[in-house]
UniProtKB/Swiss-Prot annotation:
Residues holding alpha-D-glucose 1-phosphate: 108, 173, 188-189, 206
Keywords, alphabetical: ATP-binding, Carbohydrate metabolism, Glycogen biosynthesis, Glycogen metabolism, Nucleotide-binding, Nucleotidyltransferase, Transferase
Protein name per UniProt: Glucose-1-phosphate adenylyltransferase
Species of origin: Paraburkholderia xenovorans (strain LB400)
Key word Nucleotide-binding present: yes
Pathway: Glycan biosynthesis; glycogen biosynthesis
Gene Ontology biological process terms, A to Z: glycogen biosynthetic process
Gene3D superfamilies: Hexapeptide repeat proteins (2.160.10.10), Spore Coat Polysaccharide Biosynthesis Protein SpsA, Chain A (3.90.550.10)
One MF term in the entry's GO annotations: glucose-1-phosphate adenylyltransferase activity
Taxonomy, superkingdom: Bacteria
Known EC number: 2.7.7.27
Residue spans crossing the bilayer: none
Oligomer status and interactors: Homotetramer.
Amino acid sequence: MDTPARLNDLQRTTLAIVLAGGRGTRLGPLTNKRVKPAVHFGGKYRIIDFALSNCLNSGIRRIAVVTQYKAHSLLRHLQRGWSFLRGEFGEFIDLWPAQQRVEGAHWYRGTADAVFQNLDIIRSIRPKYVVVLAGDHIYKMDYTRMIADHAESGADCTVGCIEVPRMDAVAFGVMHVDENRRVTGFVEKPADPPAIPGRPDTALASMGIYVFSADYLYSLLEENISSVDTDHDFGKDILPRVVTQGTAIAHPFSMSCVSSDPNVEPYWRDVGTIDAYWAANLDLASTIPTLDLYDRSWPIWTYQEQLPPAKFVRDMKGLQGSGNNLIVCGGCVISGSQISRSVLSSNVKVSSFCNINEAVLLPQVTVGASCRLQKVVIDRGCAIPDGTVIGEDPVSDAERFYRTDDGVVLVTPEALRQMPK
């Protein structure tokens, strides 16, 4: 029975490890300067804020963030915005950058190796359960419910899972489960994903969320590190090993998702491509978004820079700036332009006579006068020249910028510098 005392005990004996060192290559130029979990999202957040907020809201106060690739932006964000836990009470958010801590002097070679190289630190914390999380997904989830499910089942490992369209499952680990939720098969990113029996168009995908009994995890990692034929990866190596030698159960996301509307389908997004990133941002600008950022019972925490309020002003000719289905953050100024279904991050300036639709503008973007922007992601610090048109001519867009097959255009400062004057 999940009494308050038992849930509190589960929270106090759990260590959460957030994996935040991946390159995020599918996001193209957006991750040339920063790791994927540090990418801005939803106007004022970073992607990693969702996993960290889930930890805090779930009552988990012992958290480690594993970093490696281009981590400066991420480390600065965590130091400025996530340093409020009290070490006196045994609470912490520790940063575990790659340090070549083990014999052999190599950097993190995979997700499992990243945890293994910090095994001495983990053992010193003495957790009973270890939650391993990907730091690059957008969702709200009560991890304590999943930990309680793990403890009650007696499994060695519990895997968070969600149903996805079968053809989308090529980007995930895919599971087979029996009627008791026991995982009987696991394959990482298959070219031809297996379907759920009786449902040929749907697959059961891993969410990249694992709960391990700590001692069992230690033995798995020590066994894996001595193996020759391994990628040192949880999805490719550790989970298949658990399925064959131990007990793994599947934990459906619906059992622990957090939603202000129980009738809405559970919201979980992998924003690993420009198209997915753009679409997930615009989801938030809809009239009633599936992901409720205004739920005060499950807040998403982040670093709060001190900025003046956003404002819409008339231009010198008296034209009023306006917008609808629009997220606007602090420090933004919109002068005599029309903006719809878009997300404007902090300190964005839009000059007069612009028409902007379905756009995601990251912080400190400046848009010159008389611009037309459609279906774009504008990277941090871009200065769009007066009269620029993006999103109307696919050929011109592809010549100047990074354009996806679905027509989303990513604009970066580097691309703007290469444009003819």
